[in-house]
Amino acid sequence: MNVKGKVILSMLVVSTVMVVFWEYINSPEGSFLWIYHSKNPEVGDSSTQKGWWFPSWFHDGTPSNQEEEDIDKEKRREKEQRKEDDEEELQLWDWFNPKKRPEVVTVTSWKAPVVWEGTYNKAILENYYAKQKITVGLTVFAVGRYIEHYLEEFITSANRYFMVGHKVIFYIMLDDISKMPLIELGPLRSFKVFEIKPEKRWQDISMMRMKTIGEHILAHIQHEVDFLFCMDVDQVFQDNFGVETLGQSVAQLQAWWYKADPDEFTYERRKESAAYIPFGEGDFYYHAAIFGGTPIQVLNITRECFKGILQDKKNDIEAEWHDESHLNKYFLLNKPSKILSPEYCWDFHIGLPSDIKIVKISWQTKHYNLVRNNV
């Protein structure tokens, strides 16, 4: 074949390839992909979010007519699905039986369930939420020496026990992202790592997380998950922490105080503080190590708590238990729709009384002299 023939043949081959690619990118399968990395985490900060996007080749970013039709079809399908889901909405008594645990408080005065082992029907819940195709987020903060002492075990155990069988996104907030451990996540699990500003005092770290969580919910989390939990890093999952914990707003009973009288609780008792709760008031003592709900409800929680923290700073006062004091004040005024028993956040230093059937999460040993920069 002469040179002219080779040129013509090459041009035909290139044209064919381009036509094939053009047909592919204008098909539904040619849409862009979002890649979550297990070993190479996405890195961001509190105001921006970076990711890796792989657009279809030769795509100018403008949807084709076919793509617009596909989007419209998908929207109609989702609308119909939501209508069906509303008709099949799971009722409390479909899955919850308080009589299974008569020795403990299982229903609050405002009719919210207190979830203990044995009170819920796991099969019904799993079947319901599997149809919903939910995504659950989990935020955790690790700064300074908390990273090396607690983070890897927390994430590894969460990977094993948190919302098994459902899509999960871990939102990991670090003051030094270079110390992020390499962790291989299981199926349906991904994580995003964000760098946060270091604080001089651990008390400020604890309180400022309310602001940071709220910022991230507004920036992206509200569009990424259906439910969100916020947890302390110095604890470890021991057993399945599943969909029985999901709700509009979820509070955690504090292990040391769940049997105490409200007047014994370590609420903030000074009237000058925004977290003030007078004697004679209060329902339960809630642990700030775990709280959650829908993204919008968690946003409300963090906003109101941070508002109280700022008010206290303005008045030159600091609540006794920092963000936890403000969280208890919030839940006094805005009752949680679901409460988790101490089984979901237990301290083995208490022992193991008969009403604690299965420990879902346990406290880690508190090495405050090692991990806090001001004790």
Swiss-Prot record:
Feature: compositional bias, Basic and acidic residues: 72-83
Subcellular location: Golgi apparatus, Golgi stack membrane
Pfam families associated with the record: Glyco_transf_6
Cofactor dependence: Mn(2+)
Cofactor note: Binds 1 Mn(2+) ion per subunit.
The keyword Transmembrane helix belongs to this UniProt entry's keyword annotation: yes
Annotated glycosylation sites: 300
Entry remark concerning the domains of this protein: The conserved DXD motif is involved in cofactor binding. The manganese ion interacts with the beta-phosphate group of UDP and may also have a role in catalysis.
Family listed: Belongs to the glycosyltransferase 6 family.
Name the record gives this protein: N-acetyllactosaminide alpha-1,3-galactosyltransferase
The species this protein was found in: Lemur catta
Name of the encoding gene: GGTA1
